[in-house]
């Protein structure tokens, strides 16, 4: 029997009015903020770099809609409306065709990108660095910035960002604290891309996920998606849920252990937009209903000393052959990676397993985003 809890028409946050105000305040920070996301700041580029980019900016600026033209930072997925995403995906399709040595492979020649990561990363950092390199740009990089940089000496994030931006034209930041990217963007003149801020947002992952859904099932309207695993700590599911509200008739299913259920702020966000969502404890029954199964790992690093809660959540929902048998032939399985044990490697060869194609799509979407942010 399926154990399912349907949302009520008037969702109430259990902690009362105070928490409601806090949640609404938090959600407001995820909406477009002209002071952070769209601005007219003058970038501090040398005149030589500006001259190098003049021709390229002239070539592409007329092609961007007003939304992408005004985009100065990429801090959360709520910045992107449907037309902006669709336009970005068209550019991503073009980026997938860029060949080494071609004219387009030199689009960002003379530009420098800094990747500043306070948390460990393989895919995201290398994806951004590969994206910049494939377009001819240069890279200055540091990983474990909190341990080996001036942050270890007590420097504030704001001071670090002001300094780093003076060395480059764009900064890609990953930080362990939710809201850190928005805080950094407020003091910067160079464009900032949020590569993940703790349990908060991961906007470029959301963009590549939406792009992958379009590629895999052929539509972005009228489909059902299940988010599975660590929904409390997974910034990818939060960002993707927000992004998908920009499309029509998308229905959400949340399948998670009790200790890592989807947080109330996202449920409220969906309710306020009239988006249907369901919580379920039955993965097989849910798999039979959906077009996209989005699995996530249980994030041990977010549990701290609560190892007993981690053990309760670990291994509860695993995608194996029985789950694949429940999926329709036209469905797909996605995962932001890395995985631990939540997807059986035996199903990797199934044509519906899209997670490695998903990772490759991230390269093209990030190439597109770098082009948009740097070539105005």
Regions found by a protein language model. Give the residues of each.
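Phosphate/diphosphate ligand-binding glycine-rich loop within oxidoreductases
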Residues: 102, 106-214, 341-343
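Glycine-rich phosphate/diphosphate-binding loop of Rossmann-like nucleotide-binding domains
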Residues: 118-131, 215-296
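A short helix->loop->beta-strand "cap" motif at the edges of active sites that frequently abuts
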Residues: 190, 248-250, 326-332
């Amino acid at each position: 029997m399926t154990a399912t809890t349907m949302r009520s028409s008037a969702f109430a946050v259990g902690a009362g009015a105070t928490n409601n105000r806090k949640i609404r305040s938090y959600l407001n920070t995820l909406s477009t903020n002209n002071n952070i996301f769209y601005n007219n700041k003058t970038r501090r580029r040398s005149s030589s770099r500006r001259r190098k980019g003049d021709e390229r900016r002239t070539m592409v600026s007329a092609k961007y809609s007003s939304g992408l033209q005004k985009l100065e930072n990429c801090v959360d997925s709520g910045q992107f409306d449907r037309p902006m995403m669709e336009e970005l995906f068209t550019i991503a399709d073009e980026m997938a065709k860029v060949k080494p040595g071609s004219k387009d492979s030199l689009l960002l020649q003379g530009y420098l990108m800094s990747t500043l990561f306070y948390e460990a990363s393989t895919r995201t950092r290398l994806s951004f660095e590969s994206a910049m390199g494939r377009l001819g740009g240069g890279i200055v990089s540091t990983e474990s910035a909190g341990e080996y940089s001036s942050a270890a000496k007590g420097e504030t994030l704001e001071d670090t960002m002001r300094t780093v931006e003076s060395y480059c034209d764009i900064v890609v930041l990953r930080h362990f604290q939710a809201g850190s990217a928005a805080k950094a963007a407020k003091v910067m003149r160079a464009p900032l891309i949020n590569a993940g801020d703790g349990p908060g947002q991961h906007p470029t992952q959301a963009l590549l996920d939406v792009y992958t859904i379009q590629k895999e099932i052929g539509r972005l309207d009228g489909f059902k998606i299940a988010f599975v695993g660590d929904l409390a700590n997974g910034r990818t599911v939060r960002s993707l849920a927000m992004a998908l509200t920009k499309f029509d008739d998308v229905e959400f299913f949340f399948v998670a252990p009790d200790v890592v259920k989807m947080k109330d702020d996202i449920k409220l966000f969906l309710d306020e937009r009239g988006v249907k969502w369901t919580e379920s404890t039955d993965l097989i029954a849910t798999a039979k209903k959906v077009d996209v199964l989005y699995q996530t790992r249980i994030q041990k690093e977010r549990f701290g000393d609560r190892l007993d809660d981690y053990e309760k959540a670990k291994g509860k929902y695993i995608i194996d052959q029985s789950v694949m048998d429940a999926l329709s032939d036209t469905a797909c399985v996605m995962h932001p990676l890395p995985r631990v044990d939540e997807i059986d490697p035996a199903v990797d060869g199934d044509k519906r397993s899209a997670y490695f194609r998903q990772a490759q799509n991230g390269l093209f979407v990030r190439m597109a985003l770098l082009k948009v942010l740097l070539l105005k």
